[in-house]
């Protein structure tokens, strides 16, 4: 493996997290991390943690280990980026690694397919799991992740072409009694409700399909009264860009 620059090193975080590198390659990556700038090493660690947490969605949602074929499917998706050539990899989609897009999309779709939507989310009418499959396979599939105040992360795998997305929330605390989390698809004409989550809907790993994302520029989260609101009544406590 050719010694990477800092951007290339971050591209190696997902195959590293998936144990999709050889022992020798893992040793080389560890050596490069030891001499990398602190901010790069921290970003690498955060990326590894994010991938591992997302893969853990499968076991949390089904009380079983992730299907053995999932890792093979992810690796097959990126077969044109061989591990031994990752030193020449480049960030794609404005900084989004194809490895990371593949694993996050695969994990989210696998969860939906295994029935993780049966958590009682008060979303708009349920969308067939095939919608998630279409998002996963879409040529314009993208992922975006961000921290949730108070702990946990939210990830959206989405496709504007398929007009849908898959939301995965890891280790997010439930709303306080007497309140709900409400999701909003935010576009040029303002926010539109994408559903609510009460304390019973939130689990260590919560997954939902988002439909009709249209030209929405962001997915925002607010705290609202039970049943939700027609318009946000509090500032967004988290927001993920959908552009």
From Swiss-Prot:
It comes from the Bacteria. Signal peptide: none annotated. GO terms for cellular component: plasma membrane. Residues 223-243 are annotated as: Disordered. Residues 1-102 are cytoplasmic. The keyword Cell membrane applies. This is Anti-sigma-K factor RskA. The gene is rskA.
């Amino acid at each position: 493996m050719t010694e990477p620059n800092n951007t290339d090193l971050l591209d190696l975080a997902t195959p590293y997290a998936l144990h999709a590198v050889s022992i020798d390659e893992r040793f080389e990556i560890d050596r490069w991390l030891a001499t990398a700038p602190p901010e790069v090493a921290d970003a690498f660690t955060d990326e590894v943690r994010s991938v591992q947490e997302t893969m853990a969605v499968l076991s949390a949602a089904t009380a079983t280990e992730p299907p053995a074929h999932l890792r093979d499917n992810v690796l097959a998706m990126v077969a044109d980026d061989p591990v031994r050539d990752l030193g020449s990899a480049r960030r794609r989609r404005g900084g989004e690694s194809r490895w990371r897009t593949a694993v996050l999309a695969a994990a989210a779709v696998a969860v939906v397919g295994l029935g993780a939507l049966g958590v009682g989310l008060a979303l708009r009418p349920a969308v067939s799991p095939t919608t998630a499959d279409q998002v996963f396979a879409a040529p314009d599939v993208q992922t975006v992740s961000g921290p949730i105040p108070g702990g946990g992360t939210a990830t959206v795998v989405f496709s504007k072409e398929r007009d849908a997305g898959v939301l995965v929330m890891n280790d997010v605390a439930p709303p306080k009694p007497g309140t709900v989390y409400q999701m909003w698809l935010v576009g040029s004409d303002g926010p539109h409700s994408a559903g609510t989550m009460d304390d019973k809907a939130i689990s260590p790993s919560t997954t939902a399909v988002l439909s009709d994302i249209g030209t929405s520029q962001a997915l925002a989260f607010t705290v609202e009264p039970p049943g939700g609101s027609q318009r946000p009544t509090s500032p967004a406590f988290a927001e993920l860009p959908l552009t």
